[in-house]
Amino acid sequence: MQFNISDIIKILPHSYPFLLVDRVIECDPGKSIKAIKNVTFNEPFFIGHFPGHPIMPGVLIIESLAQASAICVLGKETIENKVVYLRSIENAKFRKPVTPGDTLILQANIQSVCLGVHKFRCIASVSEEKVAEATISAVLQNK
């Protein structure tokens, strides 16, 4: 399954400037997802992070992975009156900086689902090089 930005804005509650997934290139709902965040110099966070040496903040890379994970849980058929909330982030590692012009590939695979908590193994990469990784847990709840 693939989703364009029109699909994504129907699935996620986020909006500019905090919508951090541009396209889904592969999704097996409830199992795995591969998505894209195009990183441009026009991102508002580059104003202060860092002047003259722009780097995407690590927390926003993690947020991008969390948003991709939420799409994986919800799928294209958004569950009415439900939302996915971030529950925990474990073992986050940042390996290389992400800079303007990069295409950030976001991958999340569900490791387990227990009592409504979805646990994902997530990897962010640029040009097939791992730039960040984390284990993210999220819960599907009523709005």
UniProtKB/Swiss-Prot annotation:
Its main location: cytoplasm. It is found in: Cytoplasm. Disulfide bonds: none annotated. One of its GO terms (cellular component) is cytoplasm. Its EC number is 4.2.1.59. It is an enzyme of class 4 (lyase). Keywords: Cytoplasm, Lipid A biosynthesis, Lipid biosynthesis, Lipid metabolism, Lyase. GO terms for molecular function: (3R)-hydroxyacyl-[acyl-carrier-protein] dehydratase activity. SUPFAM superfamilies: Thioesterase/thiol ester dehydrase-isomerase. Involved in unsaturated fatty acids biosynthesis. Catalyzes the dehydration of short chain beta-hydroxyacyl-ACPs and long chain saturated and unsaturated beta-hydroxyacyl-ACPs. Belongs to the thioester dehydratase family. FabZ subfamily. This is 3-hydroxyacyl-[acyl-carrier-protein] dehydratase FabZ.
